[in-house]
Amino acid sequence: MNPFAPSAPLGGCLSPVIVALDFPTDADTLEFVARLEPSQCRLKVGKELFTASGRKLVDQLVARGFDVFLDLKYHDIPNTVASACRVAADLGVWMVDMHASGGRRMMEAAREAVANCSVRPLLIGVTVLTSMTDEELAELGLPAAAVQVERLARLAQSSGLDGVVCSAQEAAALKNLLGASFKLVTPGIRLADSAADDQRRVMTPAAAMAAGSDYLVIGRPITKAADPLATLTAINAGLAAR
């Protein structure tokens, strides 16, 4: 499998790497982003950063040529999620996600809301957060992660989403089950010499791609690096050499 195979690129990025912008302010974010290249990665804006900085920051990132994954994990009534996805599409984001546990009607409403957008973002379902253990799922009355992930991934696909967020440990089974065109977005990616931090189900970039992941969300190993672009370039080179 070619790790740089294109899939709905907006800014021409062929790397599978999505850098998680886990910064508290837009000033910190833009200072960091100035050290990156849009051809080398995409960017993820999560809840903390979006709450602090809002759509203005997303506009700035898109204007700089980056594909943006708006990681707000929508989970609400169908009409509300549909409206939010339509606004996200108007922002020009490349990808947006929602909890698959919100159900079929919610996901179908989201799909229909962006179907006629001039640039349609990829719609991704969140299955089981990579921070959660089987014991924590059991406390919620849910089955083990592998079972719940498969159940929600099937539901997301049949509801018309483009892919799901899953750990690399689940990627191979999901790729075999749901097919090559259904995109797998994998957080919990760490370099060989990195700590797991708050992610429980983690894997290295090469191992995750070999397992079937299409996109790799990488945060601290890049954002905390002395030379983020050099680290990113090394990751991409390692993946291209597979």
Curated annotation (Swiss-Prot):
GO BP term (any one): 'de novo' pyrimidine nucleobase biosynthetic process
Q: Which residues bind substrate?
A: 22, 44, 71-80, 130, 190, 199, 219-220
Q: Which Pfam families match?
A: OMPdecase (PF00215)
Looking up CDD domains in the UniProt record yields: OMP_decarboxylase_like (cd04725)
Q: EC number(s) on record?
A: 4.1.1.23
Looking up Gene3D superfamilies in the UniProt record yields:
Aldolase class I (3.20.20.70)
Purpose of the protein: Catalyzes the decarboxylation of orotidine 5'-monophosphate (OMP) to uridine 5'-monophosphate (UMP).
HAMAP family associated with the record: OMPdecase_type1_B (MF_01200_B)
Q: Could you give the subunit structure recorded for this chain?
A: Homodimer.
**Name the UniProt record assigns to this protein:** Orotidine 5'-phosphate decarboxylase
Organism, per UniProt?
Laribacter hongkongensis (strain HLHK9)
Q: Which gene specifies this protein's sequence?
A: pyrF
